[in-house]
Design a protein with these regions (language model features):
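Extended charged low-complexity segments that act as oligomerization/scaffolding linkers
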Residues: 33, 110, 159-317, 321-334, ...
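Glycine-rich phosphate/ribose-binding loops and adjacent secondary-structure elements
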Residues: 25, 32-34, 42-212
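Active-site entrance/lid segments in N-terminal catalytic domains of soluble metabolic enzymes
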Residues: 1-109, 315, 325-437
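A residue-identity detector for tryptophan
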Residues: 2, 92, 134, 193, ...
Length: 437
């Protein structure tokens, strides 16, 4: 995605140049090498993006950012120190430990703005970090930060795209109180973790398709994730637990497509439309049209060479001419797949009887991977199951078609306890944080 956003495609700089209100970039999932980071900061600022932040999650990564800050001085950059209580992908590092171990080094750089996050879900907790009083618990003097990261607390804001049902679940989720006592004798003093593969307070700690630790709401989706992780670690169980896997997948927003070899060609097309429409991405419609073209090529009477489609016009034909000929355009597919399914059944009635042949069964995963945007279903039960299911899973929590129990939502286990309102304006939420400071 980096190449898509900032590399060869440069989507973000182009959007910024055209007037999009994007002023900053956060570099996460690792810290670039020194030379690369220096060049990156230079290029981003030249593109009109003045605020460049790095998000370290370990002591070594924090020190890497300090070296970067020294190399680009006096240019100001931000360091977002995130502890292991943050939502979504997380480390097992305590925020307080990270800050205490590196505070002097960070503060020695006048051009480094220190922001802390991960488990800061209430105004009172944020105030402790802004004032520096968080350090008193360790017998240390005030160690104030310049800002705090607010993530989970904004998930139910009026402006948040989170679906109403998921917002309700977030309010109902107790989470882990910030003053809770941990039973983990190895946990740092201030850490409140959900053990890997377990659930506490309505929160679960699982693995994403990247095989990285992830905090998420405990629901059918999280339960399915645990099963898939188990099978990933024990691939010999894939066949024996196939029925259980399919049942678990079908309770989530990303169900199993179905046993393609047992479907007819018409059922194949109908199932695709059922799971993918309304199209949340235009490439879903592209792949649906390619599927119909594959089916037509399979069932058409012509043995070889070209044939005249009974479904679609050639590219470039106007909508008026297409309608006059009784054929469909790509715009018709974008609007609604139903007419195409009806036309397929009428033009090729044999599609309701013919079973999908093995060559087309094998081709289907190729179609699914045709574009970068993953499809909203699992096309095949194989050893890549966790990736098929886990990719591109977060948008469903913003789509009212899907129940809160079926989607992956990723608040922090501490901060979720501080969510008490639904559809409160974000200005009011941030205002409460500001007032506490």
């Amino acid at each position: 995605l980096w190449n898509l956003q900032f590399g060869s495609s440069r989507i973000v700089p182009k959007k910024r140049a055209s007037g999009a209100p994007i002023d900053g970039v956060v570099v996460s999932a690792g810290i670039p090498e020194l030379d690369e980071a220096v060049e990156l900061i230079k290029n981003l600022q030249a593109d009109g993006l003045p605020y460049v932040s790095f998000k370290p999650g370990t002591v070594d990564q924090i020190r890497q950012v300090v070296r970067i800050a020294k190399a680009v001085a006096p240019t100001t950059i931000m360091i977002q120190v995130e502890g292991g209580e943050a939502g979504g992908h997380h480390s097992w590092e305590a925020l307080d430990d990270l800050l205490a171990a590196t505070y002097a080094e960070v503060r020695a750089c006048d051009n480094l703005v220190l922001v802390a996050g991960g488990g800061i879900g209430t105004p009172e907790r944020a105030a402790d970090y802004i004032s520096g009083q968080w350090a008193h618990a360790y017998g240390l003097p005030d160690m104030p930060v310049d800002g705090v990261l607010i993530g989970t607390a904004a998930m139910t804001a009026k402006e948040a795209h989170t679906s109403p049902e998921v917002k309700q679940l977030l309010v109902k989720t107790p989470g882990i109180p910030a003053d809770a006592k941990s039973d983990d004798v190895f946990a740092p003093q201030a850490a409140h973790w959900v053990p890997s593969g377990k659930s506490v307070g309505g929160m679960s700690s699982g693995l994403s398709h990247l095989h990285a630790d992830i905090y998420e709401l405990e629901n059918d989706s999280a339960e399915c994730g645990r099963l898939l992780v188990r099978v990933m670690k024990h691939p010999e169980e894939l066949d024996s637990r196939r029925k259980e896997i399919i049942e678990a997948l079908n309770k989530t927003a990303k169900p199993y497509f179905g046993d393609l070899a047992s479907m007819t060609y018409l059922e194949w097309a109908q199932r695709f439309a059922e799971l993918a429409f309304p199209w949340v991405d235009p490439t879903y419609a592209d792949r649906f049209q390619h599927l119909l073209q594959r089916i037509e090529a399979r069932v058409n009477d012509t043995d070889s060479g070209e044939f005249t489609s009974k479904l679609f016009t050639a590219d470039g034909v106007s909508a008026e001419k297409a309608a006059a000929a009784g054929l469909l355009t790509h715009d018709d597919i974008l609007a609604d797949p139903a007419p195409a399914l009806e036309k397929l059944a009428l033009a090729y009635p044999q599609t309701a009887e013919l079973k999908v042949v093995p060559a087309d069964v094998a081709w289907f995963p190729v179609l699914v991977r045709e574009y970068p945007k993953p499809m909203p279903f699992v096309p095949v039960i194989d050893n890549d199951l966790l990736r098929w299911w886990g990719q591109d899973q977060l948008w469903q929590s913003e789509d009212q078609r899907y129940s809160a129990d079926s989607v992956r939502a990723i608040p922090g286990p501490i901060s979720v306890a501080g969510i008490t309102t639904i559809d409160e304006p974000i200005a009011d939420i941030l205002g409460r944080f500001e007032a506490a400071m």
